Amino acid sequence: ASACSDSFLQTDSPNQPSQTTYWQTESDALMALTACYDAMQSQNLYDDNIDGWKFGFLGRETSTDNGDHTWGNWMLGSSISQCTSATTDECFSMYWNANYEVIKRCNMLVENVERIPMEQEKIEAYKAEAIALRALMYCNLTSVFRDVPYLTKPLTLSEAQAPKTERSQIISSLLEDLKI
């Protein structure tokens, strides 16, 4: 006989949400959507702070024909505008990760919001908003990197190395998604 029963150990922490304890109420849906917007506050996405270390709007603009400036070589934007940046520059991975963080959160909402017992109209509204935010992130990614992994659902560990999808196919999918 065993000293412990099968239910002795809790697998879900009572102190934080999990896939089995979340997605119960409309408040959960609202918090999940808020988390999507919250991730968009990353200084690596839309930061207009001219501190020279981020690749927000300012950094992206320096990679266009408007990017000529004389800020000095210490600023991240200077290497981009002078075409001396390397693919290993940290700004690119930070920008990539920030976009995919928003995408991950949006995909979680789209995949799980239907588990919540609420009106279908509200479910569709939450999904549509998350899909629109996800589309914005893919516009960011494809404008900088062109072909990128196109993820429309949460990834499992075995799917973590997703292949790239052609930019044209991503844009077509986004346009179709936004017809909802």
Question: How should these model regions be labeled?
Answer:
Residues 4-56:
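Membrane-proximal, proline-rich intrinsically disordered regions
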Residues 6, 147-150:
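Short, conserved catalytic or interaction motifs in soluble domains
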Residues 14-18, 84, 152-159:
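Short linear capping/connector segments at secondary-structure termini
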Residues 30, 34, 38-46, 69-145, ...:
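Conserved, well-structured interaction surfaces
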Residues 57-72:
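Core domains of carbohydrate- and sulfate-ester-processing enzymes
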